[in-house]
C-alpha cells in the first residue's frame, strides 16, 4: 500500500522536480484522501500512506517556493470500486470524476495556491487544514501527566492556526516558556 500510494507519489514527483526548478515554473498535484486526513476504519495502511503524501507536499512547497514550483494535494470524494456498494446508489451517482476535475485544473493553474489540501466531490469543494492550538506553557512542577490533564481544556482548545513550517511550533513553544519564566529571548 505505501509502495503505491506514498512511494509512487515520491517517484513521480522526483522525475519532474529538477526540471520544474530549472525552468522556474511548475505545478504538482498529489492525491491524498479523507482516510489519511481523518481516518477510516480498516484502512490504516492506506490512511498512513495518504497522510505521508501531505508531509511530502508541505516540505516540497517550502523547497519549491523560490522556483515558482507549487505543490498541492487533492482529497477527492468519488465513486470508485473501493466505495461501490458502501454508499447509496443515488449518492454514488453524484460522485463522478467530472465533479472533481475542476479542482485539479485549478490546482495546476498559473494562479494556483501552494501547500493546499483541496477536497472535492459531487460538485462541492473545501480546503482541509492541519491546525495547532495555541496551547500553554506549564511550570516545571506541572509538567506531568496530571498537569496536562488539569490544563487539558486550555491546551486543547482555542487559537487554532495552520503553521507554515515545523520550526514555527518550536518558536511558539520556546516563546511561551520564556514568557512563563520571565526570560527575554532574541
For each of these PLM feature ranges, what is it?
Residues 36-38, 80:
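Conserved catalytic-site region of short-chain dehydrogenase/reductase
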Residues 39-47, 87:
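Active-site loop-to-helix junction immediately N-terminal to the catalytic Tyr of the SDR YXXXK motif
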Amino acid at each position: 500500500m505505501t509502495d503505491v500510494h506514498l512511494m509512487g507519489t515520491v517517484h513521480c514527483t522526483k522525475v519532474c522536480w529538477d526540471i520544474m526548478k530549472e525552468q522556474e515554473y511548475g505545478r504538482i498535484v498529489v492525491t491524498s484522501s479523507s482516510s489519511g486526513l481523518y481516518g477510516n476504519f480498516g484502512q490504516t495502511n492506506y490512511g498512513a500512506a495518504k497522510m505521508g503524501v501531505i508531509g511530502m507536499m508541505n516540505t516540497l512547497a517550502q523547497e519549491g517556493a523560490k522556483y515558482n514550483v507549487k505543490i498541492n494535494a487533492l482529497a477527492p470524494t468519488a465513486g470508485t470500486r473501493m466505495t461501490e456498494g458502501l454508499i447509496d446508489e443515488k449518492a454514488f451517482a453524484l460522485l463522478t470524476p467530472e465533479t472533481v476535475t475542476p479542482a485539479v485544473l485549478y490546482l495546476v493553474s498559473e494562479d494556483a495556491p501552494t501547500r493546499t489540501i483541496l477536497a472535492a466531490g459531487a460538485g462541492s469543494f473545501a480546503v482541509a487544514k492541519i491546525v495547532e492550538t495555541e496551547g500553554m506553557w506549564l511550570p516545571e512542577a506541572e509538567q506531568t501527566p496530571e498537569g496536562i490533564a488539569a490544563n487539558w481544556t486550555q491546551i486543547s482548545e482555542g487559537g487554532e492556526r495552520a503553521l507554515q513550517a515545523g520550526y514555527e511550533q518550536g518558536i511558539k513553544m520556546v516563546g511561551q516558556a520564556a514568557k512563563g519564566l520571565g526570560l527575554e529571548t532574541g
